């Protein structure tokens, strides 16, 4: 325990600097109370950083645009739908957050147990249903403080284009899916330019890998990050055995 903590070094290295042979998990008692809530709105501004980050009882915060809802055969009259899971040991904590939400300009739908199970199951179906189409998937991330502005400008790009958006609102991770687009590269480039504008990343949870190496080159801080990674790679895997085509040219 007195040695340097190398755990962070391996996070996000995508198998280029080592591999995991054993995992030890800490578990926590289940919370006494759990509620799922669906918020629907045309204006994401109501979900500012304060609301997203200042509540420890939000265990999941998922965004589905109206196209994703329609894909699930759920009628949506709003541009954005936000599915929350709230957990607490004190029921009053959940009631307090819901009271705060009631003051926002959103439709609030408290889901019963059956409805909650159905909605969370459907949320997991979205990427599966989209994978059945001719889809190009972008896995981007922007700072939570910039997420609302980013999504507002992304809507302008979406106009008259078959683009689906869903993702993890709490950490700024948005999956942007282009469907049946014969001329998709200009749209992809436009989305990446927008991501750079808000100091975002071309990779959130699915890594840079091989396909996005050329995209990563154009993002802020790339040269310094690449130089550091290259140095670490050389010291830990000088023969380039692990993930030889990931990250590096």
Name each region found by the language model:
Residues 1-14:
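Conserved mixed alpha/beta core segments that line enzyme active sites in large multi-domain catalysts
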Residues 159, 196, 200-203, 234-237:
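Hydrophobic alpha-helix feature that most strongly marks membrane-spanning transmembrane helices
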Residues 11-13, 19-190, 194-198:
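C-terminal substrate-recognition/cap domain of FAD-linked oxidoreductases
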Residues 212-249:
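Activity-critical C-terminal alpha-helical subdomain
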Residues 201-208, 243-245:
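Short acidic/histidine-rich active-site segments
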Residues 67, 117, 211-212, 249:
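Short secondary-structure capping/turn micro-motifs that flank functional sites
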Residues 182-189, 194, 207-215, 219, ...:
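Shared catalytic-loop signature of beta/alpha-barrel
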Residues 9-12, 140, 167, 203-204, ...:
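Short conserved micro-motifs on helix faces and helix-strand junctions that flank
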């Amino acid at each position: 325990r007195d040695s340097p903590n190398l755990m962070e070094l391996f996070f996000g290295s995508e198998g280029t600097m080592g591999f995991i042979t054993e995992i030890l998990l800490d578990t926590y008692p289940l919370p006494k109370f759990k509620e799922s809530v669906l918020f629907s709105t045309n204006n994401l501004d109501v979900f500012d950083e304060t609301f997203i980050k200042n509540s420890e009882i939000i265990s999941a915060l998922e965004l589905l645009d109206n196209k994703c809802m329609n894909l699930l055969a759920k009628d949506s009259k709003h541009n954005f739908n936000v599915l929350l899971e709230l957990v607490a040991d004190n029921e009053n904590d959940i009631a307090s957050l819901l009271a705060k939400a009631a003051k926002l300009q959103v439709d609030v739908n408290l889901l019963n147990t059956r409805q909650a199970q159905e909605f969370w199951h459907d949320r997991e179906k979205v990427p599966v249903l989209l994978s059945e189409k001719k889809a190009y998937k972008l896995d981007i991330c922007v700072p939570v403080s910039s997420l609302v502005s980013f999504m507002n400008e992304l809507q302008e790009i979406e106009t008259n284009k078959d683009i689906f958006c869903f993702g993890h609102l709490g950490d700024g991770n948005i999956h942007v899916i282009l469907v049946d687009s014969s001329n998709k590269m200009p749209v992809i480039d436009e989305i990446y330019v927008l991501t750079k504008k808000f100091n975002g990343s071309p990779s959130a949870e699915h890594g840079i890998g091989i396909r996005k190496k050329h995209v990563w080159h154009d993002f802020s801080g790339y040269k310094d990050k690449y130089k550091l990674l290259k140095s670490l790679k050389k010291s830990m895997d000088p023969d380039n055995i692990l993930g030889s085509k990931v990250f590096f040219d």
